Amino acid sequence: TGKMRKLFKNMLPYWHIIVVIFLLLGVQAYCDLSLPQYTSDIIDVGIQNKGIKYILPEKMPEEEYRLAELFMTEDEKDTFEAVYEKKDDTYVCTADKETLETLDDELLTPIVLTYRMANMSETDFKNTIAEALEQNPQNQITKESLDEMSIEEIGQMMQMELATYEAENDDGEMVTYVDMRPMMQQLIASGAMTQDGIAQSREYMENMIDSVGSSTLHAMGTAYAASCDEKAGLDVEHIQKNYLWSEGGKMAAMSLLMLAVAVVVGYLASRVGAGVGRDLREKIFGKVVGFSNTEMDKFSTASLITRSTNDIQQIQFVTAIMLRMLLYAPIIGIGGIYKVLKTGAHMEWIIVMAVLVISGLVMVLMSITLPKFKIMQKLVDALNLVSREILTGLSVIRAFGREKKEEERFDEANRNLTRTQLFTNRVMTFMMPGMMFIMYGVTILIVWVSAHRIDAGQLQVGAMTAFITYTMQIVMAFLMLTMMSIMLPRAGVAADRINEVITTNSSIIEKAEKETIEKHTGKVEFHHVNFRYPGADEDVLEDIDFTAEPGK
C-alpha cells in the first residue's frame, strides 16, 4: 500500500484532469451498457413483435373494440375506454408511453384472453367445445365423434355461424383458426352464457396462461395489437421498419459517442502519464546533479540510468493504462450487474461461477510469475551495469586482451534477464487462451440454460442476447482489474526505486547562513573535524585541527 500511495501521489497535480476522465468514462460506460438493451429490443420488439412495444393497439376497428372488452371486468373496461377516442369507424389510442407501460400489466390478462379466443386452432376449439358439452348431462355427442366433424358441421350443430380463417402456423403450414368471440357474444345475448360463465372461462384461461410464462404472454399481447392495427388500415410493415431504423440509429449514435469519448479519455490519460513521467525525470535529474560520490557509489550509475529511463517509463505507461482500466472496470462491472438483474434472466449464478473460475486461473498464474516480476528490474540494472562498465573501460579491456571475459560477463547478465522474461511470458501466454475458453464456455452455458427458459416462455431471445453481452462485460471488467493487479506491483516497485533517489539527500550539506569571503588568501583550516566512512559505527579521525598555508 505504501508503494501504491507513492504511485498515486505522482498524479495529484493532475486531479482536475482525472475528474474529467472519470466523468467521461461514466458516459462511455452508459453507452456501452445501453447497446445490449438496444440489441435485445431489436430482436424482441423489432423482429419478433413487428416493431410494436405495447399490447394496446394504436388503432382498432369498432367491432374489434367491442370484442376486446369481452373478458374485461367493469374496472378494466373503464380503464380501457379512458385511453381510446372514437374517430369515424375506428378507435385511436391517446395514452402516453408511461400509461401504456402501466396498462401492459393491468390489461394483459383480458387482452391475451381475447387474442387466444380470436386465434384458436381447430384442435383447441374442438377440445373446448368437448369440455363444455361434457358438463351437459343431456349431451350424447362424444369427443371422438366431435373430432371427426368439420368446423362448419359443429357450427350447424350449435346453430351458430363460426368465424374462421386460414393462416400459417409456427411450422409454416396453412391451418384453420377459429374466432370464438362472436360465438360467445351470441351465447351472452341469448342468455346461454352468464357473467359467471365468462368468469369461469377467464379463470380457466388464466391457469393456462400461468403455465406459458410472462415473456410469451407479452409477445401474444403485442401480436394482438399488430393484428388490430392491420385491421384498422395501418401499415404494420412500415411501423416495423421505422422501429428498426430508429433503434439502429440510436445504436449507431451511442457507438459514435462511445468512440469519441474513448479517444478523448485516451488522449487525457496519455497526457497525465506523460506529465507524471516528465515531473519524475525533472525531480531525479535535480537530485542526481547534486549527489556526491558517496550517493553515486550507493546507487551506481547503471541503476540511476535504469531508474531515470525504464522505471519512469513503467510508471508513465501504468498511469495511462490505470486511468483507462482501473477507473473504467468498476463502473462497467457495477453497471453490468445492475443491468443483469434488470433482465430478469435469473442466471446470476453463471456470472459468479465464471468470476470464481477466472480468479482461480489468475491466482495460479500470479503465484508463479509475481516473484519473477519483482526481480526483473534488478536484472535490468545488472545488464545496464555490465554494459556501462564495458563501454567505459573499452580501451583498457582491449589493452589487456579481456574481450572474451567481458563477453562472457555480458552474456551471463543477458541470459539471466532473457530467461526470466521468457519464463514470465510463457506462463502468461496461458492467460488469454484460458480466458477465451472460459468466456466461450460461459456463453454456451448461458445459451443452454436460456434455451430451456425460452421454451418454457420465461425468457425472450433478445433478453438472452443481452444477458450474454452483460456477462462478458462483467467478466472483462474483472479481467481488467486482474491485469492491473499484475501491472501495479511492477509499477509500485519502480515508484519505490524512484522515490528512494528523490528522498536521498546529498551527504555534502551547505550551511543555511553562508559566509562571504571578502579576501581570498588560499589558506585552508580544519577546526575540530571528525571523519567516518559511510555506514561505519565509529570515526576513524577525531578532533582534527589542521592548517594548510598557501604554497606549503
What are these regions (language model features)?
Residues 5, 16-41, 211, 243-251, ...:
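Alpha-helical segments in transporter systems
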Residues 47-54, 61-66, 73, 133, ...:
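Short intracellular "coupling" helices and adjacent cytoplasmic loop segments at the cytosolic face
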Residues 18, 54-57, 68-75, 80-85, ...:
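ABC-type nucleotide-binding domain
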Residues 1-15, 304, 308:
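A short amphipathic helical element positioned immediately N-terminal to and/or at the very start
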Residues 335, 339-356, 360, 366, ...:
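Helix-loop-helix
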Residues 31-48, 254-297, 301, 305, ...:
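Juxtamembrane helix-loop junctions of ABC transporter transmembrane domains
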Residues 13, 172, 180-184, 192-197, ...:
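An intracellular "coupling" helix at the cytosolic face of ABC transporter transmembrane type-1 domains
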Residues 42, 49, 392, 408, ...:
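ABC transporter TMD-NBD coupling linker
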